[in-house]
Amino acid sequence: MKKMVLATVLASLFFSSVAMSEDKTAFSLPAIEKSAEEGNAASQYQLGVKYEGGEGVEQNIQKALEWYTKAAEQGHAEAQLNLALMYDMNDDIERDAEKAVYWYNKAAVQGLSLAQYNLAVSFDEGDGVEQDHEKAVYWYTKAGEQGDSDAQYNLAISYDEGIGIEQDHEKAVTWYTKAAEQGHADAQYNLAVSYDEGEGVERDGSKAVFWYTKAANQGNRDAQNNLGVMYDEGDGVAKDQRKANEWYKKAALQGNGLAQNNLAINYYYGKGVKRNLKEAYAWFAVAVENGEGDEAMLKRTARALNAAQLAEAKLLAASYIAKYLDD
């Protein structure tokens, strides 16, 4: 069973970290502007936030960039992160991956977990910096130790596949677990596969079912298919082919070819559902189009239908192919 791949870069903004005092006039826009002009880094950062979000002022991305830069150059960590995010993914300015990496690094060194995570992804992908999987692992670890679930997940992938660090399936399971317990769907799925296959941990069908269910309930189609298999075979859970079909159907509707084929088989044999050869044909057909179908079973199903039924089945198959091909 395949596992999920690396997570993508997250975008997030840090807002004011300046404590409010009883003198609220000190935090009025004119007061912030005056303080910023006098060189106060926290005020410069505040002004950058206001201009970026159009908070109490007309939105002005260029001014936001200027004020973040002033604060960042004075060592303000949140300003450094926001500046990096602007260079990395703000549609209103020209993207500059190298500058993004420069400022992510500044903020990461100061301990901001999002900066550490995004810096790790930059090293992993060679985006704005020479690709370096070892450095990616270093920064995933830093962010993961602070509880960043995406970093924990990517660190687990690194251990699982031996990318940038010696392969260690047990450590992969440790980090998948940390991310999974925070609700990370892909980590839940990969942890389930680890329990299912006994990789890095003793095989445990019931724990595999537990984590497949967690991921499946979040819409992970691979987990939905695998959970269907567990119910179909009574592995780690009481055998229930009706529930198996429910999970196959959820995954099939999301374009999972294996689930489409599994659902077709159950329609063909009437397992957990009333036998329906037209449905079987249609699901076999879309599964074949997705590269996961049993072509022999598709032909076998076609032979079991009369001409009129086959014509209807082909129309149904065409509609399924239009809707449920894998993206």
PLM feature segments, named:
Residues L6, L10, K24-F27, E289-D327:
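Terminal, low-structured helical/coil segments at or just beyond the last alpha-helical repeat
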Residues F14-S16:
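N-terminal signal peptide c-region/cleavage motif recognized by signal peptidases
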Residues S21-E55, K70:
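N-terminal segments that cap or nucleate solenoid repeat domains
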Residues E37-N40, G53-E55, N60, E73-H76, ...:
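Short helix-capping/linker turns of helical repeat alpha-solenoids
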Residues Y45, E66, L81, Y102, ...:
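TPR/TPR-like alpha-solenoid signature
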Residues Q46-G53, N82-M89, N118-E125, N154-E161, ...:
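Hydrophobic face of amphipathic alpha-helices that form TPR/SEL1-like repeat modules
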